[in-house]
Amino acid sequence: MSYIKQLQNNHSSLDNSIALIDCNNFYASCERIFNPKLMRRPIVVLSNNDGCIITRSAEAKKLGIKMGEPYFKAKKIIDKNNVKVFSSNYSLYGDISQRVMETLARFAPDIEIYSIDEAFLGLNGFENYELSTYCSYIRRTIKQWVGIPVSIGVSSTKTLSKIANNLAKKNKEYDGVCILKSWFEINEALKLTPIGDVWGIGRRLSSFLQKYNIKTAYDFIQLDKGWVRKNMGVVGEKTFLELCGVSCIELDLIPSDKKSCCVSRSFSKPIEKIHNLEESISAYGTRVAEKIREEGLMAESMSVFVLTNYFNRKEKQYSNSIKLQLPFPTNNSIKIVKRALQGIRKIYREGYRYKKAGVILYGLSKSSQVKGLLDYDRESSDAIMNTMDRINGRYGSSVVRLASEGIEKSWRMKREKVSPCYTTNFDDLVEVKT
């Protein structure tokens, strides 16, 4: 008898309740919040340098616009159908994401922020509520308070809640909420789920399983558990057990400590001169320092890297990086940029057209835990950085910046269709006329 049949025959418990809340077409939905004219109009959002399509509204999907498609290839369909195009606006999306997560935290004590537009909620202890009603209330509240539509899937494991969420998103009859809490409901959902769509089953494992005529998630759970462990390892076995209703992936309520932090960008056009590279590295060093300050962290070391366009085989190729030790743990932009500039000057080579560069910080630890004899200017350093962050936070990013970042920044990432930063820049606040 198969493992799943044993569980079902023994009426194994499905009492555990995990909800996955996923924002629908998140970037496109963010753009609609402050521009009601975009409701029901097709929208696409572009990747860095306005290269590829990374988000499509439901209306854009119906037009046949593909995820990851280069913008220039889709431009004919876009122009013909009056599709609204946006450059990615991560300041806006990050702030809206934070508002969604803060709202979700009001509904359950156990929350795992999984990505910018997804979170798991532990709903154990809420069984006295009718789950469907409670989840519908969550949806309405997020829409009313933040303006973002969400889909919610609930089941006994994370993997099953992912499947439930996918059904809620794709089938209107669920009205945005799908709950799989019985063996019958789970079996029917698994029959509708291609094996390649299962969380934890990548392209390689999907191809492997299809050789054995395993086409759906339901086919997968009919396998022998020992066979799965032998052929797919511990990770495959966990996915198998999760689909069988056995929770193996706990909610990550305390995010693991960050080990590194990176800021890198592709340039709008290739860079050849060292002074342009120095400007870009200064800007990235400043931004990565800001990011760790926001999280109350300091870095012990760093690396700087550059590379040419690997896909342009007509040009000479070069890539390099250098690891650098900081004099003492710091999050001071001036010190980090100074060290980064030393690094870029060492790895720069003339005669190449550089496409991308970046700065990575390592050895991150909480500022409160860092104490050292050499950290003699900590108080002064903190005061300067706090003032800089406060001004930039109020009046817009890079209002106060290091001179080494330059002024014109011809290399800057292409963002020709970016929307205003409605929630993070005073100059972009929506004005209401009476």
Predicted feature residues:
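Short Gly/Ser/Thr- and Asp/Glu-enriched loop/turn motifs at secondary-structure junctions
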Residues: Y114-E118, S155-K158, L297-S301, Y352-K356
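Short, charged/polar surface micro-motifs in flexible loops or helix N-caps
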Residues: F26, N49-C52, N309-N312, L364-S368
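Gly/Gly-Pro- and Ser/Thr-rich, intrinsically disordered tail segments characteristic of DNA damage-repair
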Residues: M1-L241, E250, R378-T434
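Short, hydrophobic beta-strand segments
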Residues: A119-G125, N320-P327, K366-G372
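DNA-contacting surface of Y-family translesion DNA polymerases
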Residues: H11, D197, S207-R353
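Short conserved micro-motifs at the rims of enzyme active sites and ligand-binding pockets
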Residues: E315-Q317, Q369-L373, M413
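C-terminal hydrophobic structural anchor segments
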Residues: K335-R394
